[in-house]
Amino acid sequence: MSKVFHTQNLQFKKIEPRLPEFIWNTSPRFAKLADSKHLEFDIRSLDPGRFSFPFHFHRASEELFFILSGEATLRSPEGFQKVAQGDLIFFEEGPLGAHQLYNHSDVPCVYLDIRAMFGIDVCEYPDSGKINILPFQEVFEINSKVDYYKGEEQVASKWPQEIIRKPSESYIG
């Protein structure tokens, strides 16, 4: 079933995170209203002098911006460039798809943000050394990376002793 969203009189909700540099405005979550299974999409408005999300990339999601009005400066691995009304910007998965917008102008920059979502995504923030497990919003520092088997040394102690064989009883094949 098709869903039509009339955006002429769109009401934005202000999102005010802890750092004022990242205040932005968003439309309703159109993807939820459409019951979308693999796309997230909404319209965002970035006020003058504000940054979009911190510089980041997705490990399991592609993203697409379409600038509806205004202009901003895009930061990507290629450097900095101005984007304006009518520009379509694609961000691939991984470090080469890293991105961030800054509204350098005197008017809001309004853009459609479309993201492919196929389950869990890991969003990485190169500037601050964090990862974010999406959609759960669980944020961790990258430098806390550990060996896969860390803390598993006592695995047998979690099992009933009558089930566990002594190492000398182990099968050697």
Predicted regions, residues:
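A short, N-terminal "cap"/entry segment at the start of jelly-roll beta-barrel domains
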Residues: 1-38, 124-173
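Active-site donor-binding loop signature of nucleotide-sugar glycosyltransferases
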Residues: 48, 85, 116, 127
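Conserved short histidine dyad/triad with adjacent acidic residue
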Residues: 24-27, 42-58, 96
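A short beta-loop-beta micro-motif enriched in histidine and acidic residues
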Residues: 31-39, 50-63, 79
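Ligand-binding loop in jelly-roll beta-barrel domains
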Residues: 93-121
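Short acidic-glycine-tyrosine-enriched beta hairpin
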Residues: 77-94
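Short, conserved beta-strand element in jelly-roll/cupin
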Residues: 43-47, 58-74, 114-116
